[in-house]
Amino acid sequence: MKKNINVRKINKRSIVIKIIFFITIVVIIYGILEFNKINNEKNSSRLLEWEKSLKTNIFHARVKTILKEDEIKENIQKIGLTGINNKNIFFSVYDNNENIIYKIGKDGENIVPASIAKIYTLVYVLDILKDYDKEKKVKAGNEIELNSKDASAAGLIKGKEYKINDLISSAVIISAGDSVYTLTKIAYNLEKGIEINTDILKNNSTKDEKSKVVSDISEHITKYLRKKIKLSDDTNITDPTGILNTSKTSYKDMYILMKYIYSNKDKMKEIISNAETAEMQISGDFLSGKGQKLTNTNPFLNKKSSWYEDGVVGLKTGTLRGWNNLFSIFKKSDGNYYGIITVGFENRKDVNMLTKELIRRIKNESINSKGN
């Protein structure tokens, strides 16, 4: 009898323990759900504030970070990006009235421009050649040897002549390094007042001699841009093509550069008229005389690509290890232009996703240059 009573007590105690355990689990689950609910509400509130900022905050000729540094990753993840561990991620949107509409990134961080450095070089080249007939042919020389073997190239042949406009097209559309070097040579010679086709690199140059020419030309371009368009000391181009990861710039200087391109309509027209081309046939002087079909490296211009976006007009992709960059202009249906810079991402997909998202926000006026 006593044994049965003890068994019942044990069973009763076991039931009580199970009930308490169950209640505890329920309370914990409820707590987690409530925590997630509150957290989601906070996140939703932050996103609404973010949307509000995108609509109303226009920063005239100045740079300001809307989101705090510790919020950057969280908000980017909301868009669906994954490879965002690079501390140098930065993106911005600005309109054709030279207003910075939206910016996110760290103040004072240096950016590796990669192939976007070609735009810096082209601004220098087109500035020097502004009164020169770009339908004229110029001769490729020893400078094409300066282009890295693993870099993009148009296949220029030493001694052959090419239209300047074709060189510009290949530099922008397929990121041709050899064309960039030939353009740099003729601009440098014209600026110095010497015969335009004069070689800047002697025959049979050593590796050190080639490096010195690249260094000297790059230093000249950097100094020119600092003086002409007031780039800061943050910008230091060490190779006209951007193939070296030692080239540096900043998002402030990127903005200044784009502002200069926007304010100089001829410059903008010259660069964009090439950058907006998805594919084009250039003259028979390229390669074996049969001409060459160029396909733009910007996926947003390729109608066969899933990234294709009507209204995108170049400008430039840039890729080095750990640096996937895209420097684009989007033309909205109302005729307004928007410059979009996305730099420092670890993979090309993230750059494309973010650019696509920013374009979507421009279209539906989540980013609105008339917000004020």
Model-predicted segments: where are they?
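N-terminal Lys/Arg-rich, disordered targeting/topogenic segments
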Residues: M1-I15
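Hydrophobic membrane-insertion alpha-helices, especially the h-region
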Residues: K18-G31
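Membrane-interface motif at the C-terminal end of an N-terminal transmembrane signal
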Residues: I28-N43
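Penicillin-recognizing serine hydrolase domain
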Residues: N39-Y94, I100-I101, E161-L167, K185-N372
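Short, conserved catalytic-motif segment at the N-terminal edge
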Residues: N97-E109
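Active-site SXXK
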Residues: E98, V112-A140, N147, M254
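Short, well-structured active-site flanking segments
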Residues: D127-E145, D233-D234, K265-E276
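Signal peptide-directed extracytoplasmic domains
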Residues: E143-S170
